[in-house]
Structures are given as C-alpha cells and as structure tokens.
C-alpha cells in the first residue's frame, strides 16, 4: 500500500486548526502538527497532546522564544518599526519565523505540503504563503479555513460529529494573537471603530485608573543596539522583553487602538498591547539620538518606514529587506549605553541617557563660562549656508526692477 502524503500544519490548539487536522485527513493526508512557542504563554504540552488526540501522526512543539527575540523582535526595536506610525508589528514579526520552522519540519518529514489556519481576508495568509514559497518553492500550501468557508456553527457541528473537543472559551468575541513582542486583539465589539474597547479586551496592561500612583524608575542597558540588562540584572533577550511586559504593563504602557490599512485592501480596527516593545523602542531611540551622527539619524527613519512596510506586507525573505538590514546593522555598532526611564500612568518617559560613544559634548553645548564653542566661527558659516538663498533673492529683485 502506498504511503500517504504528509502535510505539516501550523497548529495552535484552537478549534480552526483542530478541525483542519480532520479535514486534511479526509483529503488524504497524514497530518504533522507543529506549534511554536514565541512567548504567548500557552500550555504547549497540552497543545502537543491535543494534536495527537485529534489525529495528527506526529506533533512538534518548538521553543523559539529566544530566536524570535534575537532575529525578529530585535530588528523591530532597532528599526523602530511602527506600521502607519502606531503598530510595532507584533503578529507580522512572528509569521516568517513560523513559516521557516514549518518548512524545516516539512523537509524533515518529507512532507509535500504545509497548511495554515488563516482566513481569506487577513494579512497572515499572505505572510505565510509568500514566506513558505520563498524558502521552498516546491512545497504546496493549503489553507483549509479559506477553502471550506464554513460558518462558526457549521464548524462546531463538523467538530462535534468527529469527536473534536470544543474549546471552553469558544464564546469569546475576540480573535487574539500573542507573542513576547505584544498582543493583538480584534473582532467582537472592536469591529465598531466608534466603540471604546472594553477592559476585558486587555490582558497585558492595566487601565490607567488601576495603575500605581507612584512612578517606577528603571535603567535599561544596551550593547551595540541590543538591550542586555534592567537595573543591572542581565537577562537573555526573550526574558528581558517578557520582564518589561510585566513591569511596564502594570503602569498601563503600550495600549494601541489602531484602524489600519490591511495588505488585502480593507481597513481593520485592532487593539494592541505592547508594553515591553514600546518601552524598548522609546529607550533605544533616545540612545541613538545620543550616539548617531546627524546624517545617519536623519536618514534612518526612511529605512525604518520601508522596513515596517516590507515586514507588514509579508516580504521578510526578500532581497530588499536583507539590504536594509545591512544598513541597520551598521548603525547599531555604537548604540551602547544606559537609558533611565520613568514608567507612570501609561507613559515611558526617558529621564536620562549616557554612553561611552556619546556625541554630546557638554562644553560645546553649555551656555556657562565653560563654553568651548567658537561663536565667531558662526559668522562665516551663516554667510556660506545662506549664500544660495541670498543669491536667489538678488536675482529675483533684479528681475522685478527690470520688469
């Protein structure tokens, strides 16, 4: 008897991907489940076992927290990637890593296809499929949820008829995605852009009414653009981000309410919580202000915006992203130092920064008797700097006289 074809499924443990296991089996595939730990806090042993109980022939759980932190979230922090000026790319960052691991498992298992649980109207289907095809063009990509187009009731009926456990939180109105870089929430009342997000939509952050009335001061140390310690205590990067999620989250930092333009052409209202990400981006930017020369500091935002768009639009494995990262890496060589941040009532306020590579010279900046700036040099500088506009004005006046 011929061996059945294998498909590797990105498995979350939820209803959609559990139903997908059975559905793919009925299409003639042996299903290999693959679940990544990118810091969402799931019971992964439970998820791994559930996949096997539903019918997967094998079930992988991969601890990818540190890889996600160092190879993906770190880039977001160093590039200050804020899609449309607001969103630090929480879900968009994890998709290429998940795709990479799916392809690795597929190649190990000699699978012919990879499957995901995305719908047909979201960004993630694009991110997954473009990434998978970039890494292995020979793999087929299957999107069961997009293909079957069932209502929720039809999906539950299918699950019940095949003995698939129905999650107890199925009546939650929200669709949530979480990793160590933050938490994304949509659907339910959030689909009304006029409706205020209920407090139940949040999990990582406290409401301003419930935040401490006393500020908390922390010091974050960076080495070559990488955050390495908080208040002198060194952490692996993934743990440092998770620690900041907890610390900044209790002060209500990192809540983002965003009506964004999706890649597929529609607008979507999303509520994000990114306490660690927003605190780190704020602190890192201040250290760059201290250590980057003016020309680099002024040009870098153009690179940041392009990187934000590329990552959001699912082009992580593109030549342009690689080229932009080469520039980014060069800018981080001297971003070393300590930033002091006050966490209070939803704000991460930088109160101090220092670096051995600081380009700030107090003797040049001061207005005291210690001033070392050559004020007389300004006369010639101003004359030369304004010369083009001066000449332009002379020519225009001459034209007016002749007219």
Curated annotation (Swiss-Prot):
<feature type="binding site">
    <location>
        <position position="175"/>
    </location>
    <ligand>
        <name>L-citrulline</name>
    </ligand>
</feature>
<keyword id="KW-0028">Amino-acid biosynthesis</keyword>
<keyword id="KW-0547">Nucleotide-binding</keyword>
<feature type="binding site">
    <location>
        <position position="119"/>
    </location>
    <ligand>
        <name>L-aspartate</name>
    </ligand>
</feature>
<protein>
    <recommendedName>
        <fullName>Argininosuccinate synthase</fullName>
        <ecNumber>6.3.4.5</ecNumber>
    </recommendedName>
</protein>
<comment type="pathway">
    <text>Amino-acid biosynthesis; L-arginine biosynthesis; L-arginine from L-ornithine and carbamoyl phosphate: step 2/3.</text>
</comment>
<feature type="binding site">
    <location>
        <position position="117"/>
    </location>
    <ligand>
        <name>ATP</name>
    </ligand>
</feature>
<dbReference type="GO" id="GO:0005737">
    <property type="term" value="C:cytoplasm"/>
</dbReference>
<feature type="binding site">
    <location>
        <position position="123"/>
    </location>
    <ligand>
        <name>L-aspartate</name>
    </ligand>
</feature>
<feature type="binding site">
    <location>
        <position position="260"/>
    </location>
    <ligand>
        <name>L-citrulline</name>
    </ligand>
</feature>
<dbReference type="InterPro" id="IPR048268">
    <property type="entry name" value="Arginosuc_syn_C"/>
</dbReference>
<dbReference type="InterPro" id="IPR001518">
    <property type="entry name" value="Arginosuc_synth"/>
</dbReference>
<keyword id="KW-0436">Ligase</keyword>
<feature type="binding site">
    <location>
        <begin position="10"/>
        <end position="18"/>
    </location>
    <ligand>
        <name>ATP</name>
    </ligand>
</feature>
<feature type="binding site">
    <location>
        <position position="124"/>
    </location>
    <ligand>
        <name>L-aspartate</name>
    </ligand>
</feature>
<dbReference type="InterPro" id="IPR023434">
    <property type="entry name" value="Arginosuc_synth_type_1_subfam"/>
</dbReference>
<feature type="binding site">
    <location>
        <position position="123"/>
    </location>
    <ligand>
        <name>L-citrulline</name>
    </ligand>
</feature>
<keyword id="KW-0963">Cytoplasm</keyword>
<dbReference type="GO" id="GO:0000053">
    <property type="term" value="P:argininosuccinate metabolic process"/>
</dbReference>
<keyword id="KW-0067">ATP-binding</keyword>
<feature type="binding site">
    <location>
        <position position="272"/>
    </location>
    <ligand>
        <name>L-citrulline</name>
    </ligand>
</feature>
<dbReference type="InterPro" id="IPR014729">
    <property type="entry name" value="Rossmann-like_a/b/a_fold"/>
</dbReference>
<dbReference type="GO" id="GO:0004055">
    <property type="term" value="F:argininosuccinate synthase activity"/>
</dbReference>
<comment type="subunit">
    <text>Homotetramer.</text>
</comment>
<dbReference type="Pfam" id="PF00764">
    <property type="entry name" value="Arginosuc_synth"/>
</dbReference>
<feature type="binding site">
    <location>
        <position position="87"/>
    </location>
    <ligand>
        <name>L-citrulline</name>
    </ligand>
</feature>
<dbReference type="Pfam" id="PF20979">
    <property type="entry name" value="Arginosuc_syn_C"/>
</dbReference>
<dbReference type="InterPro" id="IPR048267">
    <property type="entry name" value="Arginosuc_syn_N"/>
</dbReference>
<keyword id="KW-0055">Arginine biosynthesis</keyword>
<dbReference type="InterPro" id="IPR018223">
    <property type="entry name" value="Arginosuc_synth_CS"/>
</dbReference>
<comment type="similarity">
    <text>Belongs to the argininosuccinate synthase family. Type 1 subfamily.</text>
</comment>
<dbReference type="InterPro" id="IPR024074">
    <property type="entry name" value="AS_cat/multimer_dom_body"/>
</dbReference>
<dbReference type="GO" id="GO:0000050">
    <property type="term" value="P:urea cycle"/>
</dbReference>
<dbReference type="GO" id="GO:0005524">
    <property type="term" value="F:ATP binding"/>
</dbReference>
<feature type="binding site">
    <location>
        <position position="127"/>
    </location>
    <ligand>
        <name>L-citrulline</name>
    </ligand>
</feature>
<dbReference type="GO" id="GO:0006526">
    <property type="term" value="P:L-arginine biosynthetic process"/>
</dbReference>
